[in-house]
From Swiss-Prot:
Residues 1-611 form the Peptidase M13 domain. It is an enzyme of class 3 (hydrolase). This is Zinc metalloproteinase R519. It comes from Acanthamoeba polyphaga mimivirus. Its EC number is 3.4.24.-. Belongs to the peptidase M13 family. The active site is at 455, 517 (proton donor). One of its GO terms (cellular component) is plasma membrane. Zn(2+) binds at residues 454, 458, 513.
Amino acid sequence: MTYRSCIPQNDLECYYNPNKTKYKSTNILSSIQHKIDKELTAYITDKTIDDTFGNRMIVFRDSFYDKPKNSKIFRQIIHMIETSNCWYSVKFLMDNGISSLFSLGITPHHTYPKKYYPMIISPILSLESKNDYQDYLALVRLKNFIGYSYDYITKYWNYKLSNKQNFINDVMEMESQLSLVTLTIEQQNNPFVIYNSLKWREFLEKYDVDNFWSSILGSYLKKEDYVIFDNIQYLSYLREYLKNTSKNSIKNYLVYSLVKKFGLYTDLLEFYNDIVIESINHDQIFLNMFSQYFGIYLETVFETRYHDKDKKEYITKMFYDMKLYLRNYFIECKFTDKTKREISLKIDNLHMVIGRQNYQYDLENFPLMGNDFYENVLNLERYYFHESIKLIGSTINKEWFSINGGMYSFEVNAYYDPICNVLYIPTSIINDMTISLERDDVYNYGSIGTILAHEIMHSLDNFGLQVNCDLSIGNKWDISDYKFYLSDLRKIIQHRIKLSNYDIASSIDALSEDISDTLGLKLSFKTYLSKFNKKIEPDNLSTNDKIHLQKFFYSWTETFKNINNNNQDDHSPSYIRINAPLAHLDEFYYLYGVESQHLNYLDPQLRSRILDKIN
């Protein structure tokens, strides 16, 4: 019997298939999210919700439908910014969930003490990436957007501090300078870069200007508390910006921050699509808004419908089987005892939260809703901000994910947190399309198993390596083992770069995801093999064995296939994501008869050998 040299799913997404764009295909995970979104939207727009919390959501919904252009609350905020001390205005915006010169979140401290502390996050650019600020046409579109914003806020929000040209110039100057110090995608994922901390008193000595930080954060921190920050360059830039920039110029940027926060809910929406890659529509805004502000309620509704105890138990067992396989592999490998100990402890201490995460808000303080939509939003933002602020100085709970909002179980997004060494598999992914207790295990390992294994292997990807078993940052492996492991990971990246026609920037952006895709596929397949109890060699597999194991790869491709890749996705394009990891799995060659003349062949010397059989 002749076996095909490629995966058995019509080869629609194969990078070696010239017809890969001939047909459309549906991404299962996107389909799941689309179905959930439709159900949640139908629930939100239903007239018959009769519980107390749901009624608040309905009042909020109706205020959205009837939102005014001339909201009194905006005129008050604008007047405050125009007439008050700049630092007071920044604090007011922060307390009401509006990012201006920085954002503030609460996050686990990455070193001793293991407590929650505030994290200062540099502002998000208006354009999609820092590279866009080198594009003349993109800058023209941004200037036009700022101009439209000025026209809107002078007409409806009673803004009158500055003329139009000065407003545009001040905002463009801040945006352009900010683009120079904004982190790259690779840096944003690197623990060495984004996890920095100082004691509060030390932070003030280094970065405070004219009591800026002390007046804004001082009421929340004691001198021995820590401040975490993601971008040292930005803090240095901000220090100079505050020293040398006129207060009116700063105020112009604060007003623009209001536009960035609320413009999506106004007539400015049509102009947003001039400065973003992915078009924004009213349906997205509507559902994202309710997820953000009423996610705690919608999650309860969702869990009531879709919580599946048996599937959770199945995945939990799969998780421990994968951890056992992974641990045994590294115990048997040729690393030093020091490295083996570090890896073993990290795997042992790897935890999973499945279904919904356990952080609960104090709903007794949840605000009542009124008729003014924008006032409702500010009340909600203030509520969530102060709920998170209460955690400062408290001990880390590894099962809490959404202390800054988000990470709800109805969002199709598995996640690994390197600082707590814990992964999250939401209820949304525990779907009949990814796991069925009625079908052969091989399909489940090819689908939900690869998702789970992908997140597990983030703990040992290029960034996960930087966090040790004690959750400190800075790899503690034996140096020779560390270099050997990294050299093997580079094989995955070099392969990815080749498939991207040597577009190195594109590959670097997806670097950790490519590693976790490849090693996750290996881990799931080899864990399944340990249950299947067969050694994969060309001469000891029957035809039935091959047909059976091919189901794993069929399930893998059915889960991730998608031609129309999202430009904002951190992962590789789907036609690469599906196929590239297979080239590093020797068993794939045996099962499909892949030989050197085939385009999906990779020389054995160029394949990653992590998780391969130890001779």
